[in-house]
C-alpha cells in the first residue's frame, strides 16, 4: 500500500477491525519510510447484477431503490436504521451467492418479504400490498390472515340508550 504522505510502497498493518458485520475491514497502517499512520478500508467489490423485471425489461440492481422501498414500508415503525442496513446486506449477500449476472425482481421481492415478516408485520403488509399488487381489501385480508390475523367480532351499539 502506497503511503499517502511520502509515496513509499512499504507499510505495516498496526490494527485491523471488521465493520458492518464483516462486510468491510478497517486497517490502521504505519509507513516504514516516514513513520506516519493512515487508515485504509477494504470491502468485496460487488458484482454487477441485472434485475429482470416482470415485463422482461432489464435494469441494473439499485441498492438505493431497495433501501427506499424498505424505508417506505418501515415509515413510522419502531425499527432502527441498522435493521434496514441488515436487510439490505442480506439481500445483497443472497443475490451475490447465486453467482449469476441476472436475477428476477420477484426473487428480490420474496427475500425482502421474508425479512420483513420476521421484523414487522405492518411493514410486511405495506411492502406486500405493493409487491403483490393487491387489487382490493379481500387480497389484503387474505395476506393478513396468512400472518395469523383474525378479525374481531363486530361491536354493536345499543341505540336505545
Curated annotation (Swiss-Prot):
Zinc-finger ranges (unnamed): 3-34
GO terms for biological process, alphabetical: negative regulation of DNA-templated transcription
Q: Which domain of life is it from?
A: Bacteria
The ATP-cone domain extends over 49-139
Q: What does this protein do?
A: Negatively regulates transcription of bacterial ribonucleotide reductase nrd genes and operons by binding to NrdR-boxes.
Q: Which UniProt keywords apply?
A: ATP-binding, DNA-binding, Metal-binding, Nucleotide-binding, Repressor, Transcription, Transcription regulation, Zinc, Zinc-finger
Q: What is the lineage of its organism?
A: Bacteria, Pseudomonadati, Thermomicrobiota, Thermomicrobia, Thermomicrobiales
Q: How is the cofactor bound?
A: Binds 1 zinc ion.
Q: Which GO terms describe its molecular function?
A: ATP binding; DNA binding; zinc ion binding
* Keyword Thylakoid listed: no
State the family named in the UniProt similarity comment for this chain: Belongs to the NrdR family.
Would you tell me the protein name for this molecule?
Transcriptional repressor NrdR
Amino acid at each position: 500500500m502506497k503511503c499517502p504522505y511520502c509515496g513509499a510502497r512499504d507499510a505495516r498493518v498496526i490494527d485491523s477491525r471488521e465493520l458492518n458485520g464483516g462486510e468491510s475491514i478497517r486497517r490502521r497502517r504505519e509507513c516504514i519510510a516516514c513513520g506516519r499512520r493512515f487508515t485504509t478500508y477494504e470491502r468485496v467489490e460487488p458484482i454487477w447484477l441485472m434485475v429482470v423485471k416482470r415485463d422482461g425489461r432489464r435494469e441494473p440492481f439499485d441498492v438505493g431503490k431497495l433501501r427506499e422501498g424498505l424505508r417506505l414500508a418501515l415509515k413510522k415503525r419502531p425499527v432502527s436504521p441498522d435493521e434496514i442496513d441488515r436487510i439490505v446486506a442480506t439481500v445483497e449477500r443472497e443475490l451475490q451467492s447465486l453467482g449469476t449476472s441476472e436475477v428476477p425482481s420477484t426473487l428480490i421481492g420474496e427475500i425482502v418479504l421474508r425479512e420483513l415478516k420476521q421484523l414487522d408485520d405492518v411493514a410486511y403488509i405495506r411492502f406486500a400490498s405493493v409487491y403483490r399488487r393487491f387489487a382490493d381489501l379481500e387480497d389484503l385480508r387474505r395476506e393478513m390472515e396468512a400472518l395469523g390475523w383474525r378479525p374481531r367480532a363486530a361491536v354493536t351499539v345499543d341505540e336505545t340508550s
